[in-house]
């Protein structure tokens, strides 16, 4: 399942830009699997949904330029046959909770920048468990 896109039928086909070598590394250090969702804050479009197994990492690559908010669905016991709004999308069956970035300052700026030394390509690393003195705040969502 690691790297699968379980909500594509609901959100649409994932968007990629092969001309961009940017990425977000997601380290899921928690005891729950997660589906990470990237939403472009300008267009409001969900451009990616990625399943990340507990205690694994995954690189979300070739993200179209833009500024993105990350939302997560966490849980255990994935059931691919569960229905959502009449669609068979699947969902976790236990320990389900949701989170989103709490502050716009934590959004991901995925615009490449030309510098005097060349092109600066954005990359980020996110850890999906509580980190003491961590630098990204989340809020619970429904």
Language model features with spans:
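Short, acidic Ser/Thr/Gly-rich low-complexity loop/linker segments typical of extracellular
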Residues: 49-53
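Exposed aromatic-hydrophobic patches
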Residues: 57-62
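A short tyrosine-centered beta-strand micro-motif
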Residues: 68-70
């Amino acid at each position: 399942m690691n790297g699968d896109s379980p909500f594509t039928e609901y959100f649409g086909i994932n968007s990629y830009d092969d001309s961009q070598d940017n990425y977000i590394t997601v380290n899921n250090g928690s005891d729950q699997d997660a589906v990470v969702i990237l939403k472009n804050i300008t267009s409001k479009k969900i451009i990616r949904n990625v399943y990340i197994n507990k205690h694994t990492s995954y690189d979300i690559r070739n993200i179209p330029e833009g500024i993105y908010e990350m939302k997560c669905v966490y849980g255990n016991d994935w059931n691919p046959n569960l229905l959502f709004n009449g669609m068979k999308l699947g969902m976790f069956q236990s320990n389900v909770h949701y989170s989103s970035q709490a502050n716009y300052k934590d959004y991901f700026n995925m615009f490449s920048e030309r510098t005097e030394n060349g092109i600066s390509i954005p990359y980020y690393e996110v850890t999906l468990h509580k980190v003491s003195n961590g630098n990204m705040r989340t809020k619970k969502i429904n």
